[in-house]
């Protein structure tokens, strides 16, 4: 089953590169302490820009782009949780 905690979710599945990202992959961010995974999103669009959905504490569930400075600066890694 899928782990409940974000840091454990980051160990679930296979780590992939930016060039391999597909719809359904997970993207992880360090939104607090540098390098410490604390937030996850689900990729919903891969081209021309990566778009992901996630739950924001202040704004609820929302869509954002990986190209936004806030997320680009906090990107840690991508995971493919399930094999295609």
Question: Where are the predicted features?
Answer:
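Catalytic cysteine-centered active-site loop
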Residues: 1-23
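Aromatic- and glycine-rich peptidoglycan recognition patches
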Residues: 16, 33, 38-84
């Amino acid at each position: 089953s899928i782990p409940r905690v974000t840091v454990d979710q980051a160990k679930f599945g296979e780590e992939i590169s930016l060039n391999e990202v597909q719809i359904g992959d997970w993207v992880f961010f360090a939104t607090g302490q540098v390098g410490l995974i604390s937030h996850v999103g689900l990729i919903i669009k891969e081209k021309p820009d990566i778009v992901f959905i996630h739950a924001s504490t202040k704004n609820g569930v929302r869509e954002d782009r990986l190209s936004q400075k806030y997320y680009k600066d906090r990107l840690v890694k991508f995971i493919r949780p399930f094999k295609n």
